[in-house]
Amino acid sequence: MKINGKEIPYEKEVTLDILMEKQGFDIKKIAVMKNGEIVPKAEFGSTMIGTEDSLEVVSFVGGG
């Protein structure tokens, strides 16, 4: 699978929320596209990510 263009070695399917946490992302502060489609945050726990999927992750940072 790829995350932000970088190949990530993973041998099995995993839910999006678990994958993001294992990769160090704060799931409360990110938006994710899976294969070009936005994944609603409410579906992170039920969205399966396979070895051929490509993810784009955007982190939100507060500021002022």
Go through each PLM region and give its residues:
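Loop/turn positions that initiate beta-strands
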Residues: 52-55
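Compact, glycine-rich, soluble single-domain proteins
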Residues: 2, 7-35, 39-44, 58-60
